[in-house]
């Protein structure tokens, strides 16, 4: 992955690494990328050139210019779009002539990729062998919700996982009334109500979002932007459906915000409860989106 010397072509990553999602790159590598690409010079392509190669439009680039770390925001925005991968990022850097970045960060990127692949392999190895009487759910992940089968043979499933902050619980309760207790008869997964205590929150969220829930509703607010748990859940759901092709994630804005709407969700159609002109259609639109096959 790293070049062999000054001016040399960088060796391409192995196919398995090329296809890895951008989530494989840790914070340290992203920070060092910012140090290289945030600097505007006449002799080397910066983050704006990379954004153009990623097919960002002019207005999108202008918006990113207002961010304190535009490279980081660019990567966060891009990783949810179709075709985003570690391999593609390296190809674009090479195309822009940034061999200095590839030489300097190549070993670190390669190490991140190895760790990511190893983690995936370890998780796969930890899955027990299946027998006829056991469902595909992981046994240690059985009995995690109120109505779960403790033996794991009939895990509880939901129409949608609700990603929210505790401060937004009143709106979540209204969502329950509008979507569960009406003719829509949808089944929502609300952590404070449905999830049993005593298990790692990250493991439970991953299991529910990936295997138990067909969709995920993100209740976006100023407090949501400060929540590490919500950030993890959102990025995990996006990684399961890059580019939102499967309409898996639905952002909901239910009150005005002082902070900027999260860039990682800007490319997905929002269900806006704050717009008085469309408020009467809000629950119908949301219910219909959650009812899609």
UniProtKB/Swiss-Prot annotation:
One of its GO terms (molecular function) is TIR domain binding. Keywords: Cytoplasm, Immunity, Inflammatory response, Innate immunity, Nucleus, Phosphoprotein, Ubl conjugation. Disulfide bonds: none annotated. InterPro entries: DEATH-like_dom_sf, Death_dom, MyD88_Death, Myelin_different_resp_MyD88, TIR_dom, Toll_tir_struct_dom_sf. Adapter protein involved in the Toll-like receptor and IL-1 receptor signaling pathway in the innate immune response. Acts via IRAK1, IRAK2, IRF7 and TRAF6, leading to NF-kappa-B activation, cytokine secretion and the inflammatory response. Increases IL-8 transcription. Involved in IL-18-mediated signaling pathway. Activates IRF1 resulting in its rapid migration into the nucleus to mediate an efficient induction of IFN-beta, NOS2/INOS, and IL12A genes. It holds the Pfam family Death. Ubiquitinated; undergoes 'Lys-63'-linked polyubiquitination. OTUD4 specifically hydrolyzes 'Lys-63'-linked polyubiquitinated MYD88. Deubiquitinated by USP3 that cleaves 'Lys-63'-linked ubiquitin chains leading to inhibition of MYD88-induced NF-kappa-B signaling. The intermediate domain (ID) is required for the phosphorylation and activation of IRAK. Residues 110-152 are annotated as: Intermediate domain. This is Myeloid differentiation primary response protein MyD88. Expressed in esophagus, duodenum, jejenum, ileum, ileal Peyer patches, mesenteric lymph node, colon and spleen. It is found in: Cytoplasm; Nucleus. The modification Phosphoserine is found at residue 241. Homodimer. Also forms heterodimers with TIRAP. Binds to TLR2, TLR4, IRAK1, IRAK2 and IRAK4 via their respective TIR domains. Interacts with IL18R1. Interacts with BMX, IL1RL1, IKBKE and IRF7. Interacts with LRRFIP1 and LRRFIP2; this interaction positively regulates Toll-like receptor (TLR) signaling in response to agonist. Interacts with FLII. LRRFIP1 and LRRFIP2 compete with FLII for MYD88-binding. Interacts with IRF1. Upon IL1B treatment, forms a complex with PELI1, IRAK1, IRAK4 and TRAF6; this complex recruits MAP3K7/TAK1, TAB1 and TAB2 to mediate NF-kappa-B activation. The keyword Phosphoprotein applies. Residues 156-290 form the TIR domain. Its main location: cytoplasm. It comes from Sus scrofa (Pig). Residues 32-109 form the Death domain. GO terms for cellular component: cytoplasm; nucleus; plasma membrane.
């Amino acid at each position: 992955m790293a070049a062999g010397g000054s001016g040399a072509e960088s060796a391409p990553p192995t196919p398995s690494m090329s296809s890895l999602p951008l989530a494989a790159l840790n914070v340290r590598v992203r920070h060092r990328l910012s140090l290289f690409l945030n600097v505007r010079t006449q002799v080397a392509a910066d983050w704006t050139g990379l954004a153009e190669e990623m097919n960002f439009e002019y207005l999108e680039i202008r918006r990113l210019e207002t961010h304190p770390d535009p490279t980081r925001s660019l990567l966060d925005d891009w990783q949810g779009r179709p075709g985003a991968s570690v391999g593609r990022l390296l190809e674009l850097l090479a195309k822009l002539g940034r061999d200095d970045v590839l030489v300097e960060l190549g070993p670190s990127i390669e190490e991140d990729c190895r760790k990511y692949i190893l983690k995936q392999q370890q998780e796969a190895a930890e899955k027990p062998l299946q027998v006829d009487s056991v469902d595909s759910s992981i046994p240690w992940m059985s009995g995690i919700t109120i109505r779960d089968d403790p033996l794991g043979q009939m895990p509880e499933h939901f129409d949608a996982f609700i990603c929210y902050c505790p401060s937004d619980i009143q709106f979540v309760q209204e969502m329950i009334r509008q979507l569960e207790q009406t003719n829509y008869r949808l089944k929502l997964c609300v952590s404070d109500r449905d999830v049993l205590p005593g298990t790692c929150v990250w493991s439970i969220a991953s299991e529910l979002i990936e295997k138990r829930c067909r969709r995920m509703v993100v209740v976006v607010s100023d407090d949501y932007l400060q929540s590490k748990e919500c950030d993890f859940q959102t990025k995990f759901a996006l990684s399961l459906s890059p580019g939102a092709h499967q309409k898996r994630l639905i952002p909901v804005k239910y009150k005005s915000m002082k902070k900027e709407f999260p860039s990682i969700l800007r490319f997905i159609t929002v269900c806006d409860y704050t717009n008085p002109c469309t408020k009467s259609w809000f629950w119908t639109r949301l219910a219909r989106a959650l009812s899609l096959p």
